Amino acid sequence: MLNTTDYLIIALYFLIILVVGVLTGRKQDREEFLISGRKLKSLQATTTIFSSRIGAAILLTYTALVYMYGLGALWYFIGSVFGLFLFYFFGVKVKKMADEENFYTLPDFFFFLKGKFAGYLATLITIIITFGWVVLNFTAGAKLIAEYTPISYDFSVIIVGVIILLYLLAGGFDAVVKTDIIQTIGIFLLFVLMIYLLITTDTKPGLDFMDLFSLPAMQIISFFLAGFFIPMASPELWQRVYAIENKKHFRRSLFLSSLFYLIIGFILLLIGLVIREDIPDIAADTSLIVGFSMLLPAGLAGLSVVIIYSSVSSSADTYLFTTSASVTQDFLEKTGFAKKKENLRLVMRYSMLGLMILGITMALILRDIVDATFFFVSLTMSLGFVTLAIWIYPRLNRHSVNLSIFACLIGVIIPAIIVGISESLIIYAWGFCIAGILIGILINYIRPARL
């Protein structure tokens, strides 16, 4: 449990990010509210890319996978490294196109290249994916608070959602970027705590190279594909690419954020192996939280609450804003429900409020972090695979694009209902994506579509 000092630190953190959000929101125009005026420099871009990626999906889910599967979970990170390396080259092209066409969201890429139907399908997937990550991070933040304090899980979910909503309503995307700088400092403090734990613990993580191949082949493929395709279909990463000032800052920030991400991932692997050895038979999805509470000294354990919460918060605010942007710009504006001459910031604020309420409700229902991650990562495959296909072959016909996205949606939801949620959903998603493209090629041969 936390002491008075710990509670004061948490309260101070909440106060700082709220003040930053309010001050950021003053005298903003539409472009600044939506995408920071497309003028992010290397430092801002590096911190916001890095901190948005170090959320529940990496801190809790990845540690849970290490706790369950040992060194074999590293395949997820190996896939991520390859995916980020590929995105380094792809992102340059996207950046150039976004600057010329004024893109704001990932679906804008599909609207521009493959038409309205593909754009709306991409919008549907984007909203589901990003909202899923909102729920996942709400759940993670609430479990963290409930583990360390007398506050119940249900009330913790409300606290997490309301705090994030308040500074987003005030400052928009600029608030996300500026609070990410604060939260990146917290993540580096977490890095220091993890190093301290590795040095002081009597248990040393065992790294046997052959343990990488101890998993069944299908699990290895699933973990690798999950990591590989995420950058190509991460709406929040695309939004940051659009917001960066130029290609030079893009290349520098993506390289640095990827390097920091890789370092944190390796340290988390070691921490997960230590917790797996020292504290068997605990719930995997809270293994990092429980591990810190039991293995760190009392004062440092309290500090870890603030740091882990700041990491989860930095992802939750990103995904909530990205979801709201896609709902408002890709759906309400493009379908005519919201007129462009209307106050877009007001519409987005109502959207964020509605999404926050829905997110809290879903977080009260869906409490398994690992299963939720597999489900939403599988849906990510639909956009990631098609985006890669379009990059490799820009003339890919619209039938293939539309059917691949739609087939993946079916190929994830139906097996999840019938078979259940596991890492095998990623293989189903991959297979249905390929099938959709092939069927589209056949249909296009019979009835050619516009490119």
Where are these regions (language model features)?
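Membrane-embedded helix-loop-helix hairpins and adjacent transmembrane boundary segments
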Residues: 1-451
